[in-house]
Design a protein with these regions (language model features):
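Extracytoplasmic cell-surface/polysaccharide-interacting catalytic and binding patches
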Residues: 1-48, 139-153
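Amphipathic alpha-helical interface surfaces
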Residues: 36-43, 65, 81, 92, ...
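Extended, low-complexity, intrinsically disordered C-terminal regulatory tails
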Residues: 41-70
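A broad, low-specificity signal marking well-ordered, structured residues that form hydrophobic/aromatic
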Residues: 54, 83, 120
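Single, functionally critical "micro-switch" positions that shape active/binding sites
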Residues: 61, 76, 122
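Active-site microenvironments of hydrolase-like enzyme catalytic domains
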Residues: 69-84
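Catalytic cores and adjacent binding grooves of peptidoglycan-active enzymes
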Residues: 79, 87-153
Length: 153
C-alpha cells in the first residue's frame, strides 16, 4: 500500500527483529495506517523531496515488537505516529534535523545514538492530544520545537 509518493506501508512494518523473533508486525487498525500516511505526507515526504531517498530504521511497531526492542510503553511507534530515520553521516543528520525542525507537523524530534550509530526519531500526531505526556528521553538527546527544553545533536 502506497502511503505517499515515495513511501510504502511495507517500509514501516519491516523489521529484522520481528523476523528473527517470529513476530508478525502488521498494523491492526485503519487508524494506524492513517497515522503513518499523515507522518509520510507531512514530515517524511518533504524530507525526501529535499534530500533524496531516506531509510526508515523503525516505523510501526506492534506491542510485542515494541516490548522486544525495549520501546517505552506509550511509544508513538505503536500508533503509527513515529519513525526512526537512518543517518548516512552525522553531517547529513544535522541537515535532516535542521530541516525537520521547520516543519509545523513535527511533534517530537529526538537525536539518538548508541555507540557510533546515530538516528533521528521524529513523530507527528494526526489527532492532537490536548495534554500530551512528556516522552521518555531514553538516553538520547531531546529536541522539540514545541517544548522549552532544547539540546543540539
Amino acid at each position: 500500500m502506497q502511503l505517499s509518493n515515495n513511501f510504502r506501508l511495507s517500509e514501516f512494518t519491516r523489521s529484522d527483529t520481528a523476523k528473527r523473533l517470529g513476530i508478525v508486525n502488521e498494523c491492526s487498525s485503519v487508524e494506524q495506517v492513517l497515522n503513518l500516511a499523515y507522518l509520510c505526507h507531512m514530515v517524511l515526504q518533504p524530507l525526501r523531496d529535499r534530500f533524496g531517498p531516506i531509510r526508515i530504521n523503525s516505523g510501526y511497531r506492534c506491542p510485542e515488537l515494541n516490548s522486544a526492542v525495549g520501546g517505552v510503553k506509550n511509544s508513538q511507534h505503536m500508533r503509527g505516529e513515529a519513525a526512526d530515520i537512518h543517518l548516512p553521516s552525522v553531517e547529513i543528520g544535522k541537515e535532516y534535523f535542521a530541516f525537520l525542525k521547520t516543519l509545523p507537523a513535527v511533534d517530537e524530534l529526538i537525536w539518538e545514538r548508541k555507540g557510533n550509530t546515530h538516528w533521528i526519531h521524529v513523530s507527528a500526531r494526526r489527532v492532537k492530544d490536548p495534554s500530551p505526556a512528556l516522552p521518555s528521553m531514553g538516553g538520547g538527546s531531546y529536541n522539540s520545537k514545541h517544548r522549552a527544553s532544547k539540546l543540539s545533536p
